[in-house]
């Protein structure tokens, strides 16, 4: 039996500068396999038949976005980037609301610098969360031994990794629920590191959907080098 996947909007917060990459431009605009990291991050969504549209949150003075081929794609809309990730995502949700999107619509938020999302992971997320009352996120169980550090930089404790997961993206929630959670967090000055943390703060428990560990976020130069080696000859 063929599973019908739910329609969804994709939101890509792409206003960050990626200081840890120490590059001459924001990391999402670095080259990987013939196009930018951001374009790769968009591709998996643009190729999906259940996509309703994409909103990319871009800094107002961003000189790189207009030069991308995808910037003229009619399925992609641009929202203003904010000071923090949560501001950028909220601006994208406000744009969707203003254009008539429903509170019940699914929204998938994905990192601009996470270019190796597998179609199978995207379909798995959509399938497993289609009827979920809260939503959830792609994640990977922790594999390495984890240490908690003290203020002196020494090991304070070893963390039980059996219940620890690494949060990945996309993170999938209803538009209305995510909008309210992010807005309340910002008003209350709550630190929001990802969309799931806002939903958690609002009193909900997002579901963890196990994904591939190679769906990495490019944060440091060695991340990009790893992807370049992996993709060598792929395109």
UniProtKB/Swiss-Prot annotation:
**Residues flagged as site, Positions MEP for the nucleophilic attack:** 161, 217
> Can the keyword Nucleotidyltransferase be found in this entry's annotation?
yes
Q: In which pathway does it act?
A: Isoprenoid biosynthesis; isopentenyl diphosphate biosynthesis via DXP pathway; isopentenyl diphosphate from 1-deoxy-D-xylulose 5-phosphate: step 2/6
Q: Which Pfam families match?
A: IspD (PF01128)
What biological processes does GO assign it? isopentenyl diphosphate biosynthetic process, methylerythritol 4-phosphate pathway
Q: Show the catalytic activity.
A: 2-C-methyl-D-erythritol 4-phosphate + CTP + H(+) = 4-CDP-2-C-methyl-D-erythritol + diphosphate
Q: Which GO terms describe its molecular function?
A: 2-C-methyl-D-erythritol 4-phosphate cytidylyltransferase activity
Q: EC number(s) per UniProt?
A: 2.7.7.60
Q: Where is this site: Transition state stabilizer?
A: 20, 27
Protein keywords: Isoprene biosynthesis, Nucleotidyltransferase, Transferase
What task does this protein carry out? Catalyzes the formation of 4-diphosphocytidyl-2-C-methyl-D-erythritol from CTP and 2-C-methyl-D-erythritol 4-phosphate (MEP).
Similarity comment text for this entry: Belongs to the IspD/TarI cytidylyltransferase family. IspD subfamily.
Q: Spell out the protein name for this chain.
A: 2-C-methyl-D-erythritol 4-phosphate cytidylyltransferase
Q: Which source organism does the UniProt entry give?
A: Pseudomonas entomophila (strain L48)
């Amino acid at each position: 039996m063929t599973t019908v996947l739910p329609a969804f909007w994709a939101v890509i917060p792409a206003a960050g500068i990626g200081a840890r990459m120490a590059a001459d431009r924001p990391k999402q605009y670095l080259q990987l396999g013939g196009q930018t990291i951001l374009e790769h991050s968009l591709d998996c969504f643009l190729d999906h038949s259940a996509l309703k549209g994409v909103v990319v949150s871009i800094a107002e003075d961003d000189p790189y976005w207009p030069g991308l081929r995808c910037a003229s794609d009619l399925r992609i809309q641009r929202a203003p980037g904010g000071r923090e990730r949560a501001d950028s995502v909220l601006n994208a949700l406000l744009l969707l609301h203003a254009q008539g999107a429903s509170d019940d619509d699914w929204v998938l938020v994905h990192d601009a610098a996470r270019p190796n999302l597998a179609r199978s992971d995207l379909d798995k997320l959509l399938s497993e969360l289609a009827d979920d009352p809260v939503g959830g996120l792609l994640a990977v169980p922790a594999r390495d031994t984890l240490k908690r550090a003290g203020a002196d930089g020494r090991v304070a404790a070893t963390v039980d990794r059996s219940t620890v997961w690494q949060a990945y993206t996309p993170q999938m929630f209803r538009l209305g629920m995510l909008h309210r959670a992010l807005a309340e967090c910002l008003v209350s000055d709550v630190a929001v590191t990802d969309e799931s943390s806002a939903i958690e703060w609002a009193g909900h428990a997002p579901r963890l959907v196990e994904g591939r560990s190679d769906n990495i976020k490019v944060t440091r130069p060695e991340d990009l080098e790893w992807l370049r080696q992996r993709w060598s000859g792929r395109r």
